[in-house]
């Protein structure tokens, strides 16, 4: 009985009963394939930024989830434009940014955007035709793509 009582007290100390707020959830980790080459865009105010989309899923029979990630650090633009190509399997870390967006008669809704922190290439796309497509291929990585386990 003593053990049961102490384990309950211990579990109560580990569990927080405070409410979760949007600002409490910040960093997301994604693995998946890029749906197209990274895009270099310009805002209405003339600021340059980039956008890429990662498709991820939890198995072959599950529909993919698409995540748009935005890059605002112009220092990385050229490097990212070189390595982030359509079909590349990537590991991405991004910060979740929440903002209010007007929703018509209902008031406003919270919308989440993903701000790029880092991206690592796991696999480059395979060149199935054997022709020179300009994309970098790695024959040693020709194994079937791994299933996303996240």
Swiss-Prot record:
Q: Tell me where it resides.
A: Mitochondrion
What range is the organelle transit peptide?
1-22
What are the entry keywords? Answer: DNA replication, DNA-binding, Mitochondrion, Transit peptide
User: Domain named SSB: which ranges?
Assistant: 25-125
Q: Name one GO molecular function term.
A: single-stranded DNA binding
GO annotation (BP), single:
DNA replication
**Per its UniProt record, what InterPro entries does this chain match?**
NA-bd_OB-fold (IPR012340), Primosome_PriB/ssb (IPR000424)
Q: Give the matching SUPFAM superfamilies.
A: Nucleic acid-binding proteins
Q: Where is the composition biased (Basic and acidic residues)?
A: 128-141
PROSITE patterns per the UniProt record, alphabetical: SSB
A GO term from the CC aspect: mitochondrial nucleoid
> Which superkingdom?
Eukaryota
Is the Transit peptide keyword given for this protein? yes
What broad class describes the main subcellular location of this protein? mitochondrion
Q: Where is this region: Disordered?
A: 127-150
Function, as annotated? This protein binds preferentially and cooperatively to ss-DNA. Involved in mitochondrial DNA replication.
Q: What is this protein called?
A: Single-stranded DNA-binding protein rim1, mitochondrial
From what organism does this protein derive?
Schizosaccharomyces pombe (strain 972 / ATCC 24843)
The gene coding this protein: rim1
């Amino acid at each position: 009985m003593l053990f049961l009582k102490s384990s309950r007290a211990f579990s109560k100390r580990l569990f927080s009963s405070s409410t979760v707020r949007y600002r409490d959830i910040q960093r997301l980790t994604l693995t998946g394939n890029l749906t197209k080459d990274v895009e270099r865009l310009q805002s209405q105010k003339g600021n340059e930024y980039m956008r890429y989309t990662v498709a991820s899923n939890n198995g072959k029979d599950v529909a993919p989830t698409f995540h748009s990630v935005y890059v605002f650090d112009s220092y990385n633009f050229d490097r990212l434009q070189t390595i982030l190509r359509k079909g590349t399997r990537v590991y991405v870390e991004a910060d979740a940014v929440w903002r209010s967006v007007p929703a018509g008669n209902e008031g406003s809704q919270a919308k989440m955007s993903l701000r790029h922190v880092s991206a690592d290439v796991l696999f480059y796309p395979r060149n199935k035709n054997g022709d020179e497509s300009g994309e970098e291929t790695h024959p040693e990585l020709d194994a079937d793509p791994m299933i996303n386990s996240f």
